[in-house]
Amino acid sequence: MATLKEKLIAPVAEEEATIPNNKITVVGVGQVGMACAISILGKSLADELALVDVLEDKLKGEMMDLQHGSLFLQTPKIVADKDYSVTANSKIVVVTAGVRQQEGESRLNLVQRNVNVFKFIIPQIVKYSPDCIIIVVSNPVDILTYVTWKLSGLPKHRVIGSGCNLDSARFRYLMAEKLGIHPSSCHGWILGEHGDSSVAVWSGVNVAGVSLQELNPEMGTDNDSENWKEVHKMVVESAYEVIKLKGYTNWAIGLSVADLIESMLKNLSRIHPVSTMVKGMYGIENEVFLSLPCILNARGLTSVINQKLKDDEVAQLKKSADTLWDIQKDLKDL
């Protein structure tokens, strides 16, 4: 007796399992992981989305909730499991998992606890998707990108930290607000370490090719009557303020990660400030990851732009590199 489905649908091609073309995995379904997931779905970047976490109920609930929105999305398959086999054949894996910093906890201690989490996660990712590109989002992102690179054995062009992509987006938004224009028309770069010791490259800030520092030579310095330096200070403080107000940040970082993925999956060769291995650049001698303007395309992070930096900016980069290496050199089990 033919089923309703058999009566309704006459097959033309043989049914066979197809390997996804643009599968994306998000590891960790906390606030940041789910913001990445919804941003990826909203931009229709994946033909399959996989979610992984250790919390099975939360994981299943998030998966079902997204699946129920399938009518409004163009991603035909949304799957989730605590077993990493669900991630097989991913093009891109986004890592948002990790432990939170406890009050009074040193960064070294926080990083070491995250190393122990990553020691479980990273080998599993590589086992099931040996050709994937990994985007690390968990904080402290620059150190955890190094940790991921070490644990994965992947070439450095396939291990990328979300780095200063969001810091630069915040910077451009805040400057554009002051000027009354759209952030996409206000160009500026924040480089180096994600967070407190990031470097604002004032010499490169421009609107329609007009250098703002040429109009105001004191821009970014303490002598600036318009106090543009405050904009960079606001970038650094903005995450803390959002956390104070709502408990965490998630939407902007989710959108920022989807932006990086779009550049790679669509082979756009756009330039983003993301965390990459900077040994040998700007006189940095250790294996640390910091954000520089990088070209992202289908192969991953394929090139770095040689940004003209001033001496004090290079000094800041080196200082960040030393700070990171101080922590990295004491990490166990890498």
From Swiss-Prot:
<feature type="modified residue" description="Phosphotyrosine">
    <location>
        <position position="240"/>
    </location>
</feature>
<keyword id="KW-0597">Phosphoprotein</keyword>
<feature type="modified residue" description="N6-acetyllysine">
    <location>
        <position position="329"/>
    </location>
</feature>
<keyword id="KW-0520">NAD</keyword>
<dbReference type="GO" id="GO:0005739">
    <property type="term" value="C:mitochondrion"/>
</dbReference>
<dbReference type="InterPro" id="IPR018177">
    <property type="entry name" value="L-lactate_DH_AS"/>
</dbReference>
<comment type="pathway">
    <text>Fermentation; pyruvate fermentation to lactate; (S)-lactate from pyruvate: step 1/1.</text>
</comment>
<dbReference type="InterPro" id="IPR036291">
    <property type="entry name" value="NAD(P)-bd_dom_sf"/>
</dbReference>
<dbReference type="Pfam" id="PF00056">
    <property type="entry name" value="Ldh_1_N"/>
</dbReference>
<dbReference type="GO" id="GO:0006090">
    <property type="term" value="P:pyruvate metabolic process"/>
</dbReference>
<dbReference type="InterPro" id="IPR011304">
    <property type="entry name" value="L-lactate_DH"/>
</dbReference>
<keyword id="KW-0560">Oxidoreductase</keyword>
<feature type="active site" description="Proton acceptor">
    <location>
        <position position="194"/>
    </location>
</feature>
<protein>
    <recommendedName>
        <fullName>L-lactate dehydrogenase B chain</fullName>
        <ecNumber>1.1.1.27</ecNumber>
    </recommendedName>
</protein>
<feature type="binding site">
    <location>
        <position position="139"/>
    </location>
    <ligand>
        <name>substrate</name>
    </ligand>
</feature>
<feature type="binding site">
    <location>
        <position position="100"/>
    </location>
    <ligand>
        <name>NAD(+)</name>
    </ligand>
</feature>
<feature type="modified residue" description="N6-acetyllysine">
    <location>
        <position position="119"/>
    </location>
</feature>
<comment type="subunit">
    <text>Homotetramer. Interacts with PTEN upstream reading frame protein MP31; the interaction leads to inhibition of mitochondrial lactate dehydrogenase activity, preventing conversion of lactate to pyruvate in mitochondria.</text>
</comment>
<keyword id="KW-0496">Mitochondrion</keyword>
<dbReference type="Pfam" id="PF02866">
    <property type="entry name" value="Ldh_1_C"/>
</dbReference>
<comment type="similarity">
    <text>Belongs to the LDH/MDH superfamily. LDH family.</text>
</comment>
<feature type="binding site">
    <location>
        <position position="139"/>
    </location>
    <ligand>
        <name>NAD(+)</name>
    </ligand>
</feature>
<dbReference type="GO" id="GO:0006089">
    <property type="term" value="P:lactate metabolic process"/>
</dbReference>
<keyword id="KW-0007">Acetylation</keyword>
<feature type="modified residue" description="Phosphoserine">
    <location>
        <position position="44"/>
    </location>
</feature>
<keyword id="KW-0963">Cytoplasm</keyword>
<dbReference type="GO" id="GO:0005743">
    <property type="term" value="C:mitochondrial inner membrane"/>
</dbReference>
<keyword id="KW-0472">Membrane</keyword>
<feature type="binding site">
    <location>
        <position position="249"/>
    </location>
    <ligand>
        <name>substrate</name>
    </ligand>
</feature>
<dbReference type="InterPro" id="IPR015955">
    <property type="entry name" value="Lactate_DH/Glyco_Ohase_4_C"/>
</dbReference>
<keyword id="KW-0999">Mitochondrion inner membrane</keyword>
<dbReference type="InterPro" id="IPR022383">
    <property type="entry name" value="Lactate/malate_DH_C"/>
</dbReference>
<dbReference type="InterPro" id="IPR001236">
    <property type="entry name" value="Lactate/malate_DH_N"/>
</dbReference>
<feature type="binding site">
    <location>
        <begin position="30"/>
        <end position="58"/>
    </location>
    <ligand>
        <name>NAD(+)</name>
    </ligand>
</feature>
<dbReference type="InterPro" id="IPR001557">
    <property type="entry name" value="L-lactate/malate_DH"/>
</dbReference>
<feature type="binding site">
    <location>
        <position position="170"/>
    </location>
    <ligand>
        <name>substrate</name>
    </ligand>
</feature>
<feature type="modified residue" description="N-acetylalanine">
    <location>
        <position position="2"/>
    </location>
</feature>
<feature type="modified residue" description="N6-acetyllysine">
    <location>
        <position position="58"/>
    </location>
</feature>
<comment type="function">
    <text>Interconverts simultaneously and stereospecifically pyruvate and lactate with concomitant interconversion of NADH and NAD(+).</text>
</comment>
<dbReference type="GO" id="GO:0004459">
    <property type="term" value="F:L-lactate dehydrogenase activity"/>
</dbReference>
<feature type="modified residue" description="N6-acetyllysine">
    <location>
        <position position="7"/>
    </location>
</feature>
<feature type="binding site">
    <location>
        <position position="107"/>
    </location>
    <ligand>
        <name>substrate</name>
    </ligand>
</feature>
